[in-house]
Amino acid sequence: MVAGHLQEKNDFYYIVLSYKDADGKRKTKWEATGLSVKRNKKKAEALLLERRRNFMVPTAPAEIRLDDDILFSDFMLKWLEVTKSTIQITTYASYQGMVERVIVPYFRKRGIKLVDLKATDLQDFYTKQLERVKANSVIHYHANIHKALKYAVKIDLIPTNPADKVERPKKNEFKGSYYSADEIHALTEIAEGTKLEIPVLLASFYGLRRSEVLGLKWDAIDFEENTLEIKHIVTQASIDGKKVLVQADRAKTKSSLRTLPLVPPIRDRLLMLKGQQDTYRRLCGKSYNREYLGYLCVDEIGNIIRPNYVSEQFPKLLEKNGLRPIRFHDLRHSCASLLLANGVPMKQIQEWLGHSDFSTTANIYVHLDYASKLSSAQAMLEGLGYGNASA
């Protein structure tokens, strides 16, 4: 974690970060918080802590000249470096993996210059990759290549974008697995008393994403108004081969920021959890990890429950107890299927799950909405006068 402090300037808080660059030289970076000094100290301190945790020290720029002789593989690396400061750390980690492990090795081996790159070269690359990965992965490769070449056009290295002329693979239709109400009850029972209890409970009932469950803090729970606010996430990224924990006061999209009702059974369990954490903190004393104070999903000594722990231990929990294998994310699908089965309109499910638009919800869960099809069939029977027939 880099060093940093708050600085007041023109009645606003600024974050000042101090770090050593790739050459070992001490650097200082100022960032505006947009928070006025008056009554915003705690918010500013929280932002400071987040930036200190997530700040990535800029690496030395690659010694690659942007000219007519640049290889396409080298240009992709240069673009990756340029785009690093404009995107979230988790997005950069995803880009880096695709560019450095897949795209660059393929094109470097072929020695194709940027100015000589043709649509057929890209099409050959996609065809080759489809032999080993699914179409959705190739679509992601295409998206990165297209963005990089768009940048090349912008800075006048090439006149047109060859990726515009490529046929993108058709996206795979995905249907998530889901548990029935009985299976959910069985799962919550076997998870009780384990580190997965709270993640399983909240993901099943509220349909929360893994990042949203692990990002829940006590200040997002209002026990008086009985509300639960989804506004913070915890994710993990692999940067330069190292696993980095990312904590951020934001969710996937604006619609992901939502407030949900805190129902009595969940409220009671969270109050119990709060009491347990207070007890553990007193018993452990100085041994308790105070870095993650305020988070719901921590263990007995205060260590945060990491995303990879949930993904690795969840299938083991199912297998150990003889439950049908599903992914942790499928608890979100299970929540949606139960809502649909109980007559909740798709629009309300969209808002409950925090999808950015209605089409996202409809595309994912329309195959589950059989009840509405029966209703439509019945309406047609009655409309066409088929007597007492029923669908």
Each PLM stretch: what is its role?
Residues 225, 236-257, 264-266, 272, ...:
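C-terminal secondary-structure termini that scaffold catalytic or DNA-interacting sites
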Residues 139, 154, 158-160, 164-218, ...:
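Basic, Lys/Arg- and aromatic-enriched nucleic-acid-binding interface segment
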Residues 189, 193-196, 206, 260, ...:
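Short, basic (Lys/Arg/His-rich) helix/loop patches that form interaction surfaces
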Residues 186, 190-192, 239-246, 342, ...:
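DNA/chromatin major-groove-contacting recognition/catalytic segments
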Residues 1-10:
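Short N-terminal "domain-start" leader segments
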Residues 113, 164-165, 225-231, 327, ...:
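Short functional hotspots where side chains directly engage DNA or cofactors
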Residues 39-40, 80-157, 173, 304-309, ...:
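N-terminal core-binding DNA-recognition domain of tyrosine site-specific recombinases/integrases
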Residues 9-12, 19-120, 275-292, 391:
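N-terminal DNA-binding module of tyrosine recombinases/phage integrases
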